[in-house]
């Protein structure tokens, strides 16, 4: 069931969050889960439902009458100092807990139970800024809650990996390291906000901190609302033939001219037609040397034979790229809804290739055992395989 928790801290700050729990979830586990979300130690929390405080930690939430969609109130108890305090009747009562002190954690992080402070060193106290001193309990709660576990995998992969490894020591180590890092960042934030407002360096750091927060918030919203934006898409390739040789061509409407690699031109036996007077440098994301230009050749797409010209590049990982000159010449249109390339001058269409049929250099992953191979090496291997196959065909055709 989904419960909404309205939290009121000791300094009267408020926060609201939702928790997905089972009906048989015991109250003490629910307190620990609220501690994880709000930062209020379980020993200092008071949970109220229907104007009635919930006190028996071993009773289930359902036994208190809680059901899906209910709202509970979480209050932080006031500190009870056993030491006799000197009464100053003429002085007003001032709460100093909300004053930020440079170099220390926030007020909620400093309020630790006395029993824990007696057995914890200062380093251990700094490592548990939110009172999460029981990694085993936290691990059990996360494993018992698939929703929280999926959020952990999405937002904190290192901690999720340590959790799923089954090693409690590793999980505790990663958790403590992240808590210490969070405490250091919080101390740095407090130091910056407490610095001289006219200090340009401090203001620049505050500006950078705000910018990073905006980036994180933007990324969190994107992961929740549009997770598909983090995926990768396969590029648009089609099957065609040049001089009778099969070629996988990349369709790129953003390229000005149609290009072909030198290796592909050699396989298609059109290097003899290269006009080297058209040599130059192709500039885009990078620069590559243009060997020359083939002024006219035929490209077969499905059953159509289309006239096309190629600029031959010396070092090009892909075999052929159909640029805007060829696409406009034949009035081609890219139909992403049907996943086809439509040839406007003939009315025919060809389907874009799935990722499994793309050349190695265009796949999102080069495949098992080929992660370290560069696209240039793959092109050389394909050229060697094509030459070997051509030689074998010539041997078989001999009488």
From Swiss-Prot:
Please classify the protein's predominant subcellular localization into one broad category: cytoplasm
* Name of the protein this chain belongs to: Protein DDI1 homolog 2
- GO BP annotations, alphabetical order: cellular response to hydroxyurea; proteasomal protein catabolic process; protein processing; regulation of DNA stability; regulation of protein stability
What does the UniProt function comment say about this protein?
Aspartic protease that mediates the cleavage of NFE2L1/NRF1 at 'Leu-104', thereby promoting release of NFE2L1/NRF1 from the endoplasmic reticulum membrane. Ubiquitination of NFE2L1/NRF1 is a prerequisite for cleavage, suggesting that DDI2 specifically recognizes and binds ubiquitinated NFE2L1/NRF1. Seems to act as a proteasomal shuttle which links the proteasome and replication fork proteins like RTF2. Required, with DDI1, for cellular survival following replication stress.
- EC code: 3.4.23.-
Q: Where is the composition biased (Polar residues)?
A: 103-131
Motif range (Ubiquitin-binding) = 376-395
Query: Which parts of this chain are annotated as the region Disordered?
Result: 99-134
The record's section on InterPro entries has:
DDI1_N, Peptidase_aspartic_DDI1-type, Peptidase_aspartic_dom_sf, Ubiquitin-like_dom, Ubiquitin-like_domsf
Q: Which residues form the Ubiquitin-like domain?
A: 1-81
Phosphothreonine: modified positions: 104
**Pfam families named among the record's database cross-references:** Asp_protease, Ddi2_HDD, ubiquitin
Q: Which residues cross the membrane?
A: none
User: Which GO molecular-function terms appear in the entry?
Assistant: aspartic-type endopeptidase activity; identical protein binding
CDD domains for this protein: RP_DDI, Ubl_Ddi1_like
Q: Which organism is it from?
A: Mus musculus (Mouse)
Q: Per UniProt, which keywords does this protein have?
A: Aspartyl protease, Chromosome, Cytoplasm, Hydrolase, Phosphoprotein, Protease
Q: Where in the cell is it found?
A: Cytoplasm, Cytosol; Chromosome
| Family listed | Belongs to the DDI1 family.
Cystine pairings recorded for this chain: none
- What gene, per UniProt, encodes this protein? Ddi2
Which positions does the record annotate as the modified residue Phosphoserine?
Answer: 121, 128, 150, 194
Q: Where is the active site?
A: 252
Its Gene Ontology cellular component terms are:
chromosome; cytosol
């Amino acid at each position: 069931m989904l419960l909404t928790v309205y939290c009121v801290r000791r300094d009267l700050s408020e926060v609201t969050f939702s928790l997905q729990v089972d009906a048989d979830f015991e109250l003490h586990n629910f307190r620990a889960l609220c501690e994880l979300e709000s930062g209020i130690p379980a020993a200092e929390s008071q949970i109220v439902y229907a104007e009635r405080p919930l006190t028996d930690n071993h009773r289930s939430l359902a036994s208190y009458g809680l059901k899906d969609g209910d709202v509970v109130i979480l209050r932080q108890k006031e500190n009870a100092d056993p030491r006799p305090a000197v009464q100053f009747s003429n002085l007003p009562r001032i709460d100093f807990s909300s004053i930020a002190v440079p170099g220390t954690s926030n007020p909620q992080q400093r309020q630790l139970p006395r029993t824990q402070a007696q057995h914890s060193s200062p380093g251990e106290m700094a490592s548990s800024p939110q009172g999460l001193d029981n990694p085993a309990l936290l691990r059990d709660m996360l494993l018992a809650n698939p929703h929280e576990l999926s959020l952990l995998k999405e937002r904190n992969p290192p901690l999720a990996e340590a959790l799923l490894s089954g090693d409690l020591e590793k999980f505790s180590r990663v958790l403590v390291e992240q808590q210490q890092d969070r405490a250091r960042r919080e101390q740095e934030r407090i130091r910056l906000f407490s610095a001289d407002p006219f200090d340009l360096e401090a203001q620049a750091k505050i500006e950078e901190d705000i910018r990073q927060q905006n980036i994180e918030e933007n990324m969190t919203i994107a992961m929740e609302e549009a997770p598909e934006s983090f995926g990768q898409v396969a590029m648009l390739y089609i099957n065609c033939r040049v001089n009778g040789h099969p070629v996988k061509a990349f369709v790129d409407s953003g390229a000005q001219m149609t290009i072909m690699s030198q290796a592909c031109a050699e396989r298609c036996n059109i290097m003899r037609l290269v006009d080297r007077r058209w040599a130059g440098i192709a500039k885009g994301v990078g620069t590559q040397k243009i060997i020359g230009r083939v002024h006219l050749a035929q490209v077969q797409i499905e059953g159509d034979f289309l006239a096309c010209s190629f600029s031959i590049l010396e070092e090009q990982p892909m075999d052929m790229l159909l640029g805007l000159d060829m696409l406009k010449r034949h009035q081609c249109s890219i139909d992403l809804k049907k996943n086809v390339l439509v040839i406007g001058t003939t009315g025919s269409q060809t389907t874009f290739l799935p990722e499994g049929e793309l050349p190695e250099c265009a796949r999102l992953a080069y495949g098992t055992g080929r992660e370290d191979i560069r696209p240039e090496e793959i092109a050389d291997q394909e050229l060697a395989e094509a030459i070997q196959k051509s030689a074998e065909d010539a041997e078989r055709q001999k009488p």
